[in-house]
Amino acid sequence: MTRRIPFSVVTKPTGAACNLDCQYCFFLSKELLYDAGAQTMSEGTLERYVEAFLESSPDGEVTMLWQGGEPTLRGLGFFEHLMELCERYRRPAQRVRHALQTNGTLVTEEWARFFADHGFLVGVSIDGPAPLHDAYRVNRGGRGTHAMVVRGWEELARAGVETNILCTVNAANEEHGAQVYRYFRDELGARYLQFIPIVERVRAADLAQAERGWRSGTSALLYRQDGDCVTSRSTSPASYG
């Protein structure tokens, strides 16, 4: 008898593709690793993945994790098909749950209703009130995204979706911990929070390039994300610790 051991896989159905250009994002540059269009998961690949994942997973609760880039760029139809596939391939003793991480800017009433209907846990990336969030979390035009993210968050709240907030700790918000916490608790009504330190390691020779931040669609050269220096966006040990 085959003994199945629980395991986790983070699935990126759009690869590194994202509609934002957050200045500290370590993943945007991964777009250069793919041929044009090759980073999008096809529905055929999705079916093979779901079948193999559920076959390899034990009975009981099984969680599938969806991330990006920005996973909602793949479209609602893709995730509706995912639900059909999970129902087709799960064993009777399996309960399939889904967790998705999003920047929140593309979440509409329709998306929120879908997440609620299918029991998704949705993590939304927010770095605090508008001046702190917009310091680094910008769109392709370099403009702040806070208002768009909050609209998405409010749609999720109205639909009753289980949510949490993913907040990076960076040079812009590191000295405003109490303000950020109260904003999440009192204004957004968040119950679960995750804090992720931004530490952008870089070699001295690449520091000037790293300070500019990655921009999608540019011809910027890649650089190694290691070294003895850190960018000015990085949090300090004292502030984070």
Residue ranges and their predicted role:
Residues V9, V62-M64, H98-T102, V122-V124, ...:
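Hydrophobic faces of well-ordered beta-strands that scaffold small-molecule active sites
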Residues A116-V122, L188-G189:
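Glycine-enriched alpha-helix->loop->beta-strand junction motifs that scaffold or abut catalytic
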Residues R140-A147, E154, R158-G241:
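Radical SAM enzyme [4Fe-4S]-AdoMet core and its adjacent flexible, acidic
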Residues E31-L32, P71-L73, G104-E109, L121-R143, ...:
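Conserved radical SAM core fold
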Residues M1-T102, L106-R113, H118:
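Conserved alpha-helical substructure of the radical SAM core
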Residues V122-G123, V150-W153:
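A conserved non-catalytic segment of reverse transcriptases
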Residues Q23-Y24, D127, A208-A210:
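Short, flexible, mixed-charge acidic loops at enzyme active sites
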